[in-house]
A protein has these predicted regions:
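Short amphipathic alpha-helical interaction segments
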Residues: 384-396
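ATP phosphate-binding glycine-rich loop and adjacent ATP-lid/helix-beta elements
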Residues: 288-332
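Short amphipathic alpha-helical interface segments
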Residues: 356-385
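Polybasic/polar functional segments that serve as interface/processing modules
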Residues: 1-32, 36-83, 88-90, 95-98
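Active-site helix-to-loop segments that bind/position phosphate- or nucleotide-bearing substrates
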Residues: 103-263, 269-285, 289-298, 320, ...
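Intrinsically disordered, low-complexity regulatory tails
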Residues: 66-133, 260-264, 315-318, 330-339, ...
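Residue-level detection of the helix-turn-helix DNA-binding "recognition helix"
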Residues: 395-399, 407-408
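Short, cationic-aromatic polyanion-contact patches
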Residues: 351, 357-360, 405-417
Length: 417
């Protein structure tokens, strides 16, 4: 047993546990075990019943507002289990400060995080706050609505229907994001060469409508990952990476990121993959497992997501990850998803079908490159079988046309066909 983000051990009762009560209440909840040392060894408490009363009094006297918690006395080993639920009346303060968990530590939140807790406690999202700039134009939004859903009139009633404007506060931040010109960040796209030291081209789209940002990102994608093959009198469009998958990834980055930080969505384009990193981790109330399973039931920017949905840029809310996985169902190398506290990263690999490779052949395939010849010495040490089997599998993969062999003897090298 060890400490985690939602589990803390306290061998004795000191006021430091109150910071953790604040942290658990402000976010996803958690458990504190009293009478257990830092290594998870049960020590017990001298007077567990009195300790239970002391813990209750300390919480009631020190945390505001009152957190939702439950105390359980474990008579068998004289320990106490304190279960703290995520609260609704955020922020929960200890000595006028709010706390959060950082891995297994408890730290004070910064000014930005504190303001987010205040909004969360009032059930207000950043996109709903009044926009700083109230002189906004919406030519791009108007054009897209007329093209995609055939609306005839675009006026303030349209903006009210989309929850972008109200008579009391004017335009909100969601409206600002969709306006032709704004003060918000956007997307920074970099096309790399053989390594990250070689930048072939950089494109940054910011301070314009997120609809324009979305379209510009697609244009850059098409330049690098789509091409035409002439077959007789016909031209056939080919894709190295699925445009549908890229669309989903970019749309998800735009509608699920945090917009109260001045950070760009970063798109790194390589010959064999694309990486999309969006600022902000998962919204409160969603676990990484739920996100990866496509169960994104909590929307950080509901109004913005609604516009993207109406325009047909996304399908059902929260299904982007599932859709991307489906598009790669027959691919040899699958997309990868990474979630951290402050960012979400999606990696879309070059789409290549699994041409009946065995599991061992797939292991080797993933170590080879489409652009660089590799000798067996750069493959064999990284596979879970011997050099002779590796050589045999490479020969079979060559016969299948999956890889190409160049050179002879010790100079033999391999490259993906």
């Amino acid at each position: 047993m060890r400490e985690t983000r939602t589990l803390e051990f306290k061998e004795s009762i000191t006021n430091t546990f109150l910071k953790t009560v604040s942290a658990f209440s402000n976010y996803v909840g958690g458990t504190i075990l009293f009478g257990v040392d830092d290594d998870g060894n049960i020590k017990g408490l001298p007077d567990a019943r009195q300790a239970c009363l002391d813990i209750e009094n300390k919480i009631n006297d020190s945390i505001t507002p009152q957190p939702d918690y439950m105390l359980e006395l474990q008579n068998s080993d004289q320990t106490i289990k304190l279960t703290v639920k995520a609260g609704l009346q955020k922020p929960y303060l200890y000595k006028s400060k709010a706390y959060k968990r950082n891995d297994t530590a408890t730290i004070e939140v910064d000014t930005l995080e504190f303001s987010r807790l205040v909004l969360d406690g009032k059930n207000i999202r950043f996109e709903e706050l009044p926009c700083k700039d109230q002189e906004l134009s919406f030519e791009i939004l108007c054009r897209k609505l007329k093209e995609n859903i055939r609306i005839e009139n675009f006026d303030k009633d349209t903006l009210k229907t989309l929850n972008l404007y109200n008579d009391d506060n004017g335009f909100n931040n969601a409206a600002g994001l969709l306006a032709d010109k704004n003060h918000f960040p956007g997307i920074d796209i970099v096309k790399f060469g053989e390594n990250i030291s070689i930048i072939q081209k950089r494109s940054t789209f910011e301070n314009v409508s997120v609809l324009e940002v979305y379209e510009k990102a697609l244009e850059v994608f098409r330049d690098y990952y789509q091409y035409e093959v002439i077959q007789g009198a016909d031209r056939k469009k080919m894709e190295k990476i699925s445009e549908a998958a890229f669309r989903e990834a970019i749309a998800n980055a735009l509608i699920h990121r945090v917009w109260d930080v001045d950070s760009q969505i970063r798109v790194s384009m390589f010959d064999d993959r694309i990486e999309i990193v969006s600022p902000g981790g998962l919204p409160s109330g969603i676990t990484e497992e739920e996100y990866l399973a496509g169960k994104l039931s909590v929307l950080r920017n509901r109004n913005l997501a609604n516009v993207f949905y109406r325009l047909g840029f996304v399908e059902i809310f929260g299904t982007g990850i599932t859709r991307i996985k489906q598009l790669y169902a027959e691919a040899l190398i699958k997309p990868d998803f990474e979630v951290s506290e402050n960012a979400i990263k999606i990696m879309l690999p070059i789409f290549e079908k699994n041409v009946d490779l065995t599991e061992d052949e797939i292991v080797i395939y993933k170590l080879l490159s489409k652009t660089m010849l590799k000798p067996i010495s750069e493959v064999a040490p990284y596979v879970p079988f011997g050099k002779s089997k590796t050589t045999k599998l490479l020969k079979e993969m060559c016969q299948k046309g999956v890889i190409t062999v160049e050179g002879k003897g010790k100079g033999t090298k391999y490259i993906i066909s």
